[in-house]
Amino acid sequence: MTVIYLEKRFLKIIMGSQISFTAVGDIFMNRMLPEAGYEGLSELSELISSSEVRFANLETTIHDREGYPFPFSGGTWAMAHPSVLDDLKKYNFNLYNAANNHSMDYSHNG
């Protein structure tokens, strides 16, 4: 299932003639970032925040670590606790894709 969330203000932007768009590839994040962060992340956040549409492919499933990996999902089970979403908020993404090859790593409940 793909979930697309567009804020009302984007409808006005889309109806205009130009928008700025930043897209990043797979975010495969399975733990929170260190409190001090990493070198260069603040600059990356500024770059991402400079666009009106900020898209990321969330390659990791987000859940509370209950359940077991689905045995037929391919052997690489991507999972992160919901707390990693707090770190992702720092980068101001406003559009996520969650439909990918890891969507069923923990079956229907994951």
Q: Can you describe what each PLM-predicted range is?
A:
Residues 2-110:
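Acidic, metal/ion-coordinating pockets
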